[in-house]
């Protein structure tokens, strides 16, 4: 992270004694429009994602819970519906491609603002220099994957309706702070925010507010003065479970578990999965075919995947297998998975559609695990899709979840666990 992303949010102290800029923003005329037509100030979401991350190489597009890291915040920003434009500022081709796949526009960051010494403010000012239409910038941190559209909607309202010049995100923490011991300077520690003789209980103390770095919104005039926090300021308090930041490797597994339980998965309301269709070759198996001396076909699969299938079935999810290859009856029988299977399939989408109708399901209740070009249409159509880690690039682009495991090496079990977590989210949302 650069200086701002680590919390140094200005190049100097915020202006003091400056008159409050609390007046609602003036409406601006649409450029190129006829007289009398007005529009609100242009609010742009801007995600800074350079390719030279030192903590975790290319972390901005590393898969978190099967989704490129940057994808989580882009999904939230686009679905919030409050931005006139959503941008990613980057100097890297791969990050640019991922950003466009999620529907964001791309600003190619210059080498001058892509250095290790460059600050977020440098990159934001550069962006504004190229985009005169932008009046307000919502700088959203790529490393905050639990961000929800509702957070952004409320902040946009604070800026547009309540007249704030800048709003930044905070989280409430109940942590006692102590001074640092420095040899030759301070030999003992002292409490900074408590009286040890009267230690408060958590429920008796409001705690303190800390910046969590999730986002910084500021008006153009403030940014051009060199600040992201100033003028009429306000904080936006995020829920603790949504306050996640990824900086080093140790943060990754913690963030992954948090995002699976508290992350934003899109506008579509999650439905409980009732049917999982899995491609045999390259998903259930590793795609290798062995031929014995007597010309018999031999394939193998991971016991973990068999257990995953069993767990799915016990939870009430039908599991069916599909293949475009002509697998022999002996081979299918030897699998001993007790799943309905269709082989020699030339049109997988038609077959899955037939199964769906047979079970009286909508597409949102169907999950699909595939790995080949022939699986792409199914992957795009179903409610929940995934591919093994070694799937072809076309299939990877068509899905929302990419397994860490390869085909025939635990991908089904991993996807099953993912399905169970999503079912838990559905049940929790219903209870609420």
Swiss-Prot record:
Single Gene Ontology MF annotation: N-acylneuraminate cytidylyltransferase activity
Motif (BC1 motif): 15-31
InterPro entries: CMP-NeuNAc_synthase, Cytidylyl_trans, HAD-like_sf, HAD_sf, Nucleotide-diphossugar_trans
Annotated consequence of substituting residue 199 to A: Abolishes both the nuclear localization and the enzyme activity
Ranges of biased composition (kind: Basic residues): 18-29
Keywords: Acetylation, Methylation, Nucleotidyltransferase, Nucleus, Transferase
GO biological process: CMP-N-acetylneuraminate biosynthetic process; N-acetylneuraminate metabolic process
Modified residues (N-acetylmethionine): 1
Residues the record marks as active site: 199
This protein's GO CC annotations: nucleoplasm; nucleus
PANTHER family: HAD SUPERFAMILY MEMBERS CMAS AND KDSC, N-ACYLNEURAMINATE CYTIDYLYLTRANSFERASE
Protein name: N-acylneuraminate cytidylyltransferase
Source organism of the structure: Mus musculus
């Amino acid at each position: 992270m650069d200086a701002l992303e680590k919390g140094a949010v200005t190049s100097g102290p915020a202006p003091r004694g400056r008159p409050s800029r609390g007046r609602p923003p003036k409406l601006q005329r649409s450029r190129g429009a006829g007289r009398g037509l007005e529009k609100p100030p242009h609010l742009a979401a801007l995600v800074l994602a350079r390719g030279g991350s030192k903590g975790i190489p290319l972390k901005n597009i590393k898969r978190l819970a099967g989704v490129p890291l940057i994808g989580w915040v882009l999904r939230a920003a686009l679905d919030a519906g409050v931005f006139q434009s959503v941008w990613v500022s980057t100097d890297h081709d791969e990050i640019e491609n991922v950003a466009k796949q999620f529907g964001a526009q791309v600003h190619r960051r210059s080498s001058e603002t892509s250095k290790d010494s460059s600050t977020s403010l440098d990159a934001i000012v550069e962006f504004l220099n190229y985009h005169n239409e932008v009046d307000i910038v919502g700088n959203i941190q790529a490393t905050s994957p639990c961000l929800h559209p509702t957070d952004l909607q409320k902040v946009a309202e604070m800026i547009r309706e309540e007249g704030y010049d800048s709003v930044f995100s905070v989280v409430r923490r109940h942590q006692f702070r102590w001074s640092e011991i420095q040899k030759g300077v301070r030999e003992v520690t002292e409490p900074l925010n408590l009286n040890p003789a009267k230690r408060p209980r958590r429920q008796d103390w409001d705690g303190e507010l800390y910046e969590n770095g999730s986002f910084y919104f500021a008006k153009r005039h403030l940014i051009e003065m060199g600040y992201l926090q100033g003028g009429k300021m306000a904080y936006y308090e995020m829920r603790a479970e949504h306050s996640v930041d990824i900086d080093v490797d140790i943060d990754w597994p913690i963030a992954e578990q948090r995002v699976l339980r508290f992350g934003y998965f899109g506008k579509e309301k999650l439905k409980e999965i009732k049917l999982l269709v899995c491609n045999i070759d390259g998903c259930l198996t590793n795609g290798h075919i062995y031929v014995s001396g007597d010309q018999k076909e031999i394939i193998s699969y991971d016991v973990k995947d068999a257990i995953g299938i069993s767990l799915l079935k016990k939870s009430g999810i039908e599991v069916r297998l599909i293949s475009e290859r002509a697998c022999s009856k002996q081979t299918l029988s030897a699998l001993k998975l007790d799943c309905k299977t269709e082989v020699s399939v030339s049109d997988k989408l038609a077959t899955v559609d037939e199964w769906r109708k047979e079970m009286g399901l909508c597409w949102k209740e169907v999950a699909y695990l595939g790995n080949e070009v022939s699986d792409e249409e199914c992957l795009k159509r179903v409610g929940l899709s995934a591919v093994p880690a070694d799937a072809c690039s076309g299939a990877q682009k068509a899905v929302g979840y990419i397994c860490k495991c390869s085909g025939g090496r635990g991908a089904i079990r991993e996807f099953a666990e993912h399905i169970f977590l999503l079912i838990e989210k559905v049940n929790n949302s219903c209870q609420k």
